[in-house]
């Protein structure tokens, strides 16, 4: 019998949630995703030292101002790691906009353009890039404009139906609803354990997937942030799943049979009128879990971006 990972691939596009090139080679995903935390982790791998040095040299050539050099080096390093990953995956790389811009539409758009330009300068077409943005109202509005320019976006840190609906209405190419972090919140809040079928993160992604398919939205649903393989198996049939190396290995070493759980809609009906900003903010605010986890996620990505910049600043100053 084929291993569980291979059984999953006919139903769902597998994406590697890592910046570790060796892990990507091992599991042969279609796409890969990175974020500030993964870039920070990848920067500590000795084999990546040349990518860091290249980013440092490039930043020095762009400006004499240290603060600008640090920002430029961070952007170039994220793109350098993306370029290495694109040598392996046949599909796309997701590269994230600085989380500290999550509430600034215009700055997010400017940063997205910069990242795309860096990829294009290295010979990579924008069709192979997804720009990751937090699913704040401002991030969703930035994605709407970028999509109209032909720059595809991955809306991340998505924890609620309100966020998912707004992303689809904005024409986002892809969303990344976070399964495991939803589970974490409910376990802490209730003190209960949940089976894979009752897992609140699984239930959330299933609901979003069914809503999108029933209303004919083309936005891709890519489940993310998994805590165990049970969650992954319950979402077989989801458009895409982005999975970290440890769980990819577990799936590869398993022969648990896969049954497609998420299925296309049998009929498509017209969606409701688009949400206003006020509706979005109210509905999102009604979901305490989503409010807490989005804020926490932005803070944590910003912390790791800061740590990365300290490392780069030290190198730039030496």
Curated annotation (Swiss-Prot):
Keywords: Cytoplasm, Pentose shunt, Schiff base, Transferase. It is found in: Cytoplasm. This is Transaldolase. GO terms for biological process: carbohydrate metabolic process; pentose-phosphate shunt. One of its GO terms (molecular function) is transaldolase activity. It catalyses: D-sedoheptulose 7-phosphate + D-glyceraldehyde 3-phosphate = D-erythrose 4-phosphate + beta-D-fructose 6-phosphate. Transaldolase is important for the balance of metabolites in the pentose-phosphate pathway. It comes from the Bacteria. Homodimer. Pathway: Carbohydrate degradation; pentose phosphate pathway; D-glyceraldehyde 3-phosphate and beta-D-fructose 6-phosphate from D-ribose 5-phosphate and D-xylulose 5-phosphate (non-oxidative stage): step 2/3. The active site is at 132 (schiff-base intermediate with substrate). One of its GO terms (cellular component) is cytosol. Its EC number is 2.2.1.2.
């Amino acid at each position: 019998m084929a291993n569980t990972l291979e059984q999953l691939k006919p139903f769902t596009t597998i994406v590697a949630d890592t910046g570790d090139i060796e892990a990507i080679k091992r599991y042969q995903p279609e796409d890969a995703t990175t974020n500030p935390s993964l870039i920070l982790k990848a920067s500590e791998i000795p084999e990546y030292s040349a990518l860091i040095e290249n980013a440092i040299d490039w930043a020095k050539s762009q400006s004499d101002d240290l603060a600008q050099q640090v920002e430029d080096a961070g952007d170039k390093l994220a793109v350098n790691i993306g370029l290495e990953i694109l040598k392996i995956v046949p599909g796309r790389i997701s590269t994230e906009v600085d989380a500290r811009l999550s509430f600034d539409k215009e700055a997010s758009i400017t940063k997205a353009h910069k990242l795309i330009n860096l990829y294009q300068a290295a010979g990579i077409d924008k069709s192979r890039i997804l720009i990751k943005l937090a699913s704040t109202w401002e991030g969703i509005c930035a994605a709407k404009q970028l999509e109209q320019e032909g720059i595809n976006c991955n809306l991340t840190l998505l924890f609620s139906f309100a966020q998912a609906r707004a992303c689809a209405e904005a024409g986002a190419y892809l969303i990344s609803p976070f399964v495991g972090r939803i589970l974490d919140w409910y376990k802490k809040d209730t003190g209960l354990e949940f089976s894979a079928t009752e897992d609140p993160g699984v239930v959330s992604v299933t609901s979003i997937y069914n809503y999108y398919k029933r209303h004919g939205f083309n936005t891709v649903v890519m489940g993310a942030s998994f805590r165990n393989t049970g969650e992954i198996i319950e979402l077989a049939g989801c458009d895409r799943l982005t999975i970290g190396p440890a769980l990819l290995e577990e799936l590869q070493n398993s022969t648990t049979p896969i049954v497609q759980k998420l299925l296309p809609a049998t009929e498509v009906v017209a969606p409701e009128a688009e949400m206003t900003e006020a509706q979005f903010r109210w509905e999102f605010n009604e979901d305490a879990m989503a409010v807490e986890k989005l804020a926490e996620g932005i803070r944590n990505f910003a912390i790791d971006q800061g740590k990365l910049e300290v490392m780069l600043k030290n190198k730039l100053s030496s």
